[in-house]
Amino acid sequence: GAASLVVITGGLPEGETDLFAVRERALEGFHRLIEPARASGVRLAFEPLHPMVCGGRSVISRVADALDFLDALNTDDVFGLAVDSYAVWWDLDLAASLRRAGPRLLHFHVSDWLRDTEDVRFDRGMPGDGVIDNRRLREWMEDAGFRGPVEVEIFSEKNWWRRDPDDVVRTILDRRAEFL
């Protein structure tokens, strides 16, 4: 089975505007997952998402806020962190937050933010197509102690999803040395 599973908080419910209250409810919900997760032996890797999707998908956007959330749960044997370059590349405090995360780093997802993206969910670029310095982010992850796999996560409805899968894999392999 899986060693860990990526989880998100979810966004604000319809009609809700109190971000702080929703974060507190999310924290309460994750507290209820501690014992079932511990019993299963599967760690939960909490993933902050880009602030552009905060309303509907996640009420936590910065790695520092995710770490505060994990600190409040106080169960590093159960919870860790998933870092998605697409979601956190813009955070000027990211390097310090990754150092703070240290052994709680469980997953690392990479893609690229296109300069003129048309859809924040389904218009991701392949590493090297946009503005994210994935190589630097990987170095920060490794400096913080991360030794896991780098997962290329391309949600690209109008581009990469329409290509031959073998070509997509070849592109990833061709670009890994330069951009990852």
Question: What is the role of each PLM region?
Answer:
Residues G1-G80, W90-L92:
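Active-site acidic/histidine proton-transfer and metal-coordination neighborhood
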Residues A2-A3, I60-V83, A87-L180:
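Histidine-acidic metal/acid-base catalytic patches
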